Amino acid sequence: ALVLIDKKNRKRERKLKGFTKEVSTGTKSISFFLSPSDVKNTSYLSYNWDDPSKDNDSWLYLPSLQKTNRISGGDRSNSFMGSDFTYADLDGVEIEDYTYKIVKDSDVVDGADCWVIEATPKSKDVIKETGYLKTLTWIRKDIFFGVKGRILVKKGKKVKLWSAKDIKKIDGVWVAKTQQMTTTKKKKREHSSIFIIDTIAFNKKLDDSLFESEAMQRGY
């Protein structure tokens, strides 16, 4: 589920189902919105290539227009379906595009000791693509897993606060079943979004046809 919370604490919930498949050249993912009716059958398809010189590909299908829109590099900093998460947040970043430094060797988050790592984009192109100037991430030392983030947004002098909760090991993989992103300005909350995973399974056989543009239009 994706829960959107405005500054007056009014909530809207969107149900979705997603699939991800590792292929020889990278990772393919597709998500289908199930409800409410205004977003039902909207779908998002992304290809994240292992080759850092190759741009990732992603598309959004809007059933009301019966149209599939390609998400270009300049659009990846845009909001995903009205949420505080961007397309770039969903697709992830190229590690090689940033310089890193440990700004704090020890900080405790939810009882777990963490490193605090600062990531700075190496180029203006990366800033344009992500919309972010700098990111602080709290990484748990015991499981090498990100649990908290503070993101400096390029536009509007805003700061995003990210957190990962309900962290479980499922089929040998560490997963945050709840992720929240909050947009703030002058330390005041403007909007929040929460991704909640109800059920998750790994190592399932998925047909390649599920990750093609035709599948977006067929819906789930």
Residue map of PLM features:
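Gly/Pro-enriched, hydrophobic low-complexity segments
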Residues: 34, 45, 57-61, 67-71, ...
